[in-house]
Amino acid sequence: MKLKIDIATNNFKHGGGTERYTLDLVKGLNRQNITPAVYATKFDHGIPEYALIEPHLVDQHRTLKKLRSFLFSSRLAQTRKNSAAKLIACHHADYADLLICGGTHLGYLHHMAQKPNLLDRLAIRRNRSNYATAKLIMAHSHMMRRELVGLYGVPPEKIQ
């Protein structure tokens, strides 16, 4: 039986951070003869990696721009409702088999010495849900690991 992988990301394009990580992940899976289904709000059809995926649009064009990140997880769930594949989340998504964590909102606020406003509180709530429902979390640094455990109460054994 061939392994089926879904990847959730905001934008499938060349860029920094999670965009680069997503493209590297797609290329690595392709070398293993796995064609992932990629769920994203936007796709760059002109990049070579586009030919290596099965694209699925997470439609958010009717959602207010400031709220898109908060509603991505529910739109993703609707879009992939018939998928039995393992989910790798490179963007905010609940119930991921593997959640990629490059930063936490509480950590950002702490390091910037800022108090949370309404949008920050929504982002923190979204983070808590994403971390609580993920089976595994890959923290990109020791600092991320400390923030996940210390600020969000994520069990250390859940973090890779």
Language model segments and positions:
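An amphipathic, basic-hydrophobic alpha-helix
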Residues: 61-87, 120-129
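A conserved, positively charged/aromatic
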Residues: 78-80, 108-117, 128-135
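N-terminal strand-loop element at the rim of the active site
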Residues: 9-15, 28-64, 153
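Extreme N-terminal starter segment of soluble prokaryotic enzymes
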Residues: 1-6
